[in-house]
């Protein structure tokens, strides 16, 4: 960062300049994913005395920045001008917009409560393991978590970005967040009517209603709720009748200020075989990507799970699991459960060697999928260097750094020894590989942008 102090007594353009420097610092420090989630749409408004006023696009983003990042932003402003004593973050509503408040369902809809079609209890469909308290938050899922929390805590008002659309790969926490919303509402506002179900079950209930001539009851059931959560919406792709019913249900709920939460394995724009009008509406609200887990997040998930289970696991075993089981949270927790169960049944201590033996089939599966050659090709392509540079000894930073990253990924994603990895990189010895891995690990401690880049490469390689 520049150490030049920029006077705020100059023309207004200087105020904007300071914010542009602060925004760049936020991008450099937190990385592209988090920056785009929270700061990219924040604008400088004005400076009043020693206070800088910023404008956030929504109350939700304003409140989250205030609670999590206000002090950091103030310190960055003060770095450029120490006359600044405080910051204020506001929102400016568009003309004609109002806060939507949910009214109680009409008596007509409430009267169907005893219908067989409507007899299921929301609590019976929720998993007791999936609450906000045991959801581990990290950079890859922070936006999704904050939005889900805001929906749950809305206390009768609709979350300002409706619907909330969560998307990401299998086992990354989307379903966990939807269950957590359901639990929170039932515990803190039990009079609100909530339905959570998979898109597949939604379709089957619709088909059953058609067969039993209970379509009116079906419509009333889903259109009278306060919160409707549909998991894995991609299931209705190519199913025209179900799409038609979902479309009208969606419109009715949104028009009546009811909350919708949708999950999917891809973004709305990437959905195929689904009507454009549905695709458009799914993107109306907040679209939150649940990214692949980082090493730090996997470590946090393991430590949280171990604490819940009240077991003792050696640190080297935890680090091994966090570095080797990178596909998704579900597989990570499954591997941990398998290691603990094996120890309980055999009365053998949990050691790194035992863990490697217990999980050898899973690790071999990963080995079959990813090779050192795969890593070299992907990294070379990503950094726009020649594949031959992976085998060379060129020390130019634009070549050496990608080569170090490729060595780090080879150690992380394959079971190859340092010596074997060295052979794949132009017959380099194991100390060269060790140095490269150590260098990347040191950079990852503070370089969030590099961390996200490596996580992206892992995601590409695993898919």
Swiss-Prot record:
It comes from Rickettsia prowazekii (strain Madrid E). Keywords: ATP-binding, Cytoplasm, DNA replication, DNA-binding, Lipid-binding, Nucleotide-binding. Residues 125-343 are annotated as: Domain III, AAA+ region. ATP binds at residues 171, 173-175. Belongs to the DnaA family. Pfam families: Bac_DnaA, Bac_DnaA_C, DnaA_N. SMART domains: AAA, Bac_DnaA_C. CDD domains: AAA, Bac_DnaA_C. Oligomerizes as a right-handed, spiral filament on DNA at oriC. NCBIfam families: DnaA. The lineage of its organism: Bacteria, Pseudomonadati, Pseudomonadota, Alphaproteobacteria, Rickettsiales. Residues 84-124 are annotated as: Domain II. GO terms for biological process: DNA replication initiation; regulation of DNA replication. Residues 1-84 are annotated as: Domain I, interacts with DnaA modulators. This is Chromosomal replication initiator protein DnaA. Its main location: cytoplasm. The gene is dnaA. Plays an essential role in the initiation and regulation of chromosomal replication. ATP-DnaA binds to the origin of replication (oriC) to initiate formation of the DNA replication initiation complex once per cell cycle. Binds the DnaA box (a 9 base pair repeat at the origin) and separates the double-stranded (ds)DNA. Forms a right-handed helical filament on oriC DNA; dsDNA binds to the exterior of the filament while single-stranded (ss)DNA is stabiized in the filament's interior. Residues 344-463 are annotated as: Domain IV, binds dsDNA. It is found in: Cytoplasm.
């Amino acid at each position: 960062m520049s150490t030049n102090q920029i006077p705020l007594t100059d023309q207004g353009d200087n105020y904007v300049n300071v914010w542009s420097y602060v925004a760049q610092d936020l991008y450099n420090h937190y990385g592209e994913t988090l920056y785009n989630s929270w700061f990219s749409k924040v604008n400088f408004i004005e400076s009043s005395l020693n206070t800088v006023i910023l404008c956030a696009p929504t109350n939700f983003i304003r409140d989250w920045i205030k609670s999590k990042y206000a002090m950091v932003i103030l310190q960055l402003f003060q770095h450029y001008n120490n006359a600044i004593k405080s910051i204020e973050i506001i929102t400016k509503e568009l003309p004609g917009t109002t806060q939507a408040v949910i009214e109680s369902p009409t008596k007509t809809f409430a009267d169907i409560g005893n219908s067989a079609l409507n007899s299921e209890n929301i609590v019976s469909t929720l998993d007791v393991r999936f609450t906000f308290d045991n959801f581990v938050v990290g950079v890859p899922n922070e936006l999704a978590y904050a939005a889900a929390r805001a929906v749950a805590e809305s206390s009768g008002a609709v979350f300002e970005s409706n619907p909330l659309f969560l998307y990401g790969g299998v086992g990354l926490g989307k379903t966990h967040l939807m269950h957590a919303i359901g639990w929170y509402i039932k515990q803190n506002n039990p009079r609100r009517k909530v339905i959570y179900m998979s898109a597949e079950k939604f379709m089957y209930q619709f088909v059953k209603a058609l067969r039993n001539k209970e379509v009116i009851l079906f419509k009333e059931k889903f259109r009278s709720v306060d919160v409707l959560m549909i998991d894995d919406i991609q299931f209705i792709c190519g199913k025209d009748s179900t799409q038609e019913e979902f479309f009208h249900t969606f419109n009715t709920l949104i028009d009546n200020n009811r909350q919708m939460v949708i999950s999917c394995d891809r973004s709305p724009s990437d959905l195929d075989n689904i009507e454009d009008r549905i695709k458009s509406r799914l993107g109306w609200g907040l679209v939150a990507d649940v990214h692949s887990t980082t090493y730090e997040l996997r470590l946090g998930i393991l430590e949280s799970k171990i604490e819940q289970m009240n077991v003792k696991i050696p640190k080297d075993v935890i680090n091994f699991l966090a570095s080797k089981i990178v596909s998704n949270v579900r597989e990570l927790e499954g591997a941990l459960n398998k290691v603990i169960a094996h120890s309980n049944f055999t009365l053998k201590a949990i050691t790194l060697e035992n863990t490697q033996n217990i999980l050898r089939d899973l690790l071999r599966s990963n080995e079959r999928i990813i090779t050192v050659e795969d890593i070299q090709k992907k990294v070379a392509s990503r950094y726009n260097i020649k594949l031959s540079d992976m085998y060379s000894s060129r020390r130019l930073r634009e070549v050496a750094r990608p080569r170090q990253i490729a060595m780090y990924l080879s150690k992380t994603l394959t079971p190859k020894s340092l010596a074997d990895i060295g052979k794949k990189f132009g017959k380099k010895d194991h100390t060269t590989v060790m140095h490269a891995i150590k260098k990347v690990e040191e950079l990852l401690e503070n370089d969030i942008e590099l961390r996200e880049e490596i996580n992206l490469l892992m995601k590409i390689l695993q898919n």
